[in-house]
Amino acid sequence: MSQPRIGQKVVVDVPATTANLGPGFDCLGAALDLNNRFAMRRIEGSGERFELIIEGTYGSHLRGGPDNLVYRAAQRVWKAANMEPVALEARVRLAVPPARGLGSSATAIVAGLMGANALVGEPLSKEKLLELAIDIEGHPDNVVPSLLGGLCMTAKAASQRWRVVRCEWISSVKAVVAIPSIRLSTSEARRAMPKAIPVSDAVVNLGALTLLLQGLRTGNGDLIADGMHDRLHEPYRWRLIKGGDDVKAAALEAGAWGCAISGAGPSIIALCAEDKGQAVSRAMVKAWEAAGVASRAPVLNLQTSGSHWQPADAG
């Protein structure tokens, strides 16, 4: 383990994620085949220096400096590895839009951790990176699938150790993700929720989550339809999304089995059979257009490999 040389660079690819999928609030998340790419390079200067260069449509919403999540995550690696921090530049090709409920912040955290760790010879294990990622983000449902890939259920055990279960998602189930031009911060979406819920609502969610996971494992659309319901967060969040109810109704009318807010929103995810994907996509975009909101709705697959890095000269 040694300090990276000036100019040393790694490239980290990190997938978007969708969290909750209805009943899996703050514990269930899935990686999608839409990636942000981070090229991280050591530059001259003190460890407090961090430069951010954004490529892509959404760059105007992000800033560099010490509060940037890539920088903060990298600092956690230096500290955990007992190393002096170094100056970094991060050049980001942004395909995952921020403040849309698709884990953009998780991509920054995972990239900062994985990239900084790679630059110094990977002294930290993937398990340690996972622990740091959850600590920085504050909840596991985006950072875990972003790092590991696939459909992940994460819970803190009685031992206070984070436990991750990789769940099955059959390839015949497709995700249509309607991404609007409007933004919604996670903090605003969390403020909309009550501080306490009835036990009956928690019981309904437990049952729904069981049905959803079995539906995703088997491709049973009826189970997905019955399982993709929530009483913990969605009843309080739909009203924050302009036209959201109409987009959901349009997706179901076009043949989707189920529909949910992606993460904190405002993006909306619909699950359907492969032959329904394009029809569901068109219906969701049209419904948002009627509400005066521009959007796009790609049909996406589960991304199973998670985040990975390579030396810059390898690609």
Curated annotation (Swiss-Prot):
Enzyme Commission code: 2.7.1.39
Protein name: Homoserine kinase
EC main group: transferase
Annotated organism of origin: Parasynechococcus marenigrum (strain WH8102)
Keyword Repressor (UniProt): no
PANTHER family in the record: HOMOSERINE KINASE, HOMOSERINE/4-DIPHOSPHOCYTIDYL-2-C-METHYL-D-ERYTHRITOL KINASE
Gene (UniProt): thrB
Chief site of localization: cytoplasm
Functional description taken from the UniProt entry: Catalyzes the ATP-dependent phosphorylation of L-homoserine to L-homoserine phosphate.
Cellular localization per UniProt: Cytoplasm
UniProt GO cellular component terms: cytoplasm
GO BP field: threonine biosynthetic process
HAMAP family: Homoser_kinase
Catalytic activity: L-homoserine + ATP = O-phospho-L-homoserine + ADP + H(+)
Annotated pathway: Amino-acid biosynthesis; L-threonine biosynthesis; L-threonine from L-aspartate: step 4/5
SUPFAM superfamilies associated with the record: GHMP Kinase, C-terminal domain (SSF55060), Ribosomal protein S5 domain 2-like (SSF54211)
Source organism phylogeny: Bacteria, Bacillati, Cyanobacteriota, Cyanophyceae, Synechococcales
Lipid metabolism as UniProt keyword: no
Keywords noted in UniProt: Amino-acid biosynthesis, ATP-binding, Cytoplasm, Kinase, Nucleotide-binding, Threonine biosynthesis, Transferase
Record-listed ATP binding positions: 97-107
Family to which this protein belongs: Belongs to the GHMP kinase family. Homoserine kinase subfamily.
GO molecular function, a single term: ATP binding
UniProt cross-references to PROSITE patterns, sorted A to Z: GHMP_KINASES_ATP (PS00627)
InterPro entries the record matches: GHMP_kinase_C_dom, GHMP_kinase_C_sf, GHMP_kinase_N_dom, GHMP_knse_ATP-bd_CS, Homoserine_kinase, Ribosomal_Su5_D2-typ_SF, Ribsml_uS5_D2-typ_fold_subgr
